[in-house]
Amino acid sequence: EMACLMHDIGNPPFGHFGEAAINHWFNTNLASVTPERCREPNTGIGVIFKHLAQDICNFEGNAQGIRIIHSLQTLNLTYSQSAGILKYTRPAGLDVKDIPQNKNYLMKKVGYYYSEKAFVEALQNELTIEPYCRHPASYIMEAADDISYCLADIEDAIEKGIITIELLCTVLKNHYQKVLINLTIDDTEHQDFVSKAVNYALERGKAQPYNFNSEFFIYLRVALLHPLV
């Protein structure tokens, strides 16, 4: 629960568009504002600046979240709590071409910065997590996030008139049955899971006809989120 509440703590205003704007500005302007003493690659400050330049030219909300909880706000979380929001395992200084083939998904984005490198290494050591691997809780957090924002996107589609609730109910029920066939699940509880959730949400929505759409989605989320996660 803590990981789900905090996983987006590093996102900038305007989300991914904000990330793109920050990266564009630094990649375009960093060279022109870099002090001369930082340009010497073989000096101590030059080496450190190279790492920090890679950080700020690869701004990523997930990595910024690790920086916030550890370096900026010093929230004093446990290693397990911190590992729960470490969604990607690629350090900012690692080039994309150097990513191990079997870790493509976990390292497709920057997961932490040079400033948190020692912290992440200590975390991995204490929790016996192999390099570039995740804590199990982060997988659960990611699944919860995917389910949550997918439902939010569907709700937006209803509000904007792109689809109707009637169509949504039909599609949810039919698609769930197709998924069940592939999973070879035949017990009654799972067979009726989505149908019961949809029917329950419809009943609650009809009880508040002046606010039907909002009521429907409130109870659809309640019925789906926890069981799915």
Question: For the regions a protein language model found, what residue spans apply to each?
Answer:
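Sequence-structural signature of the catalytic-core scaffold of metal-dependent phosphohydrolases
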Residues: 1-2, 9-220, 229
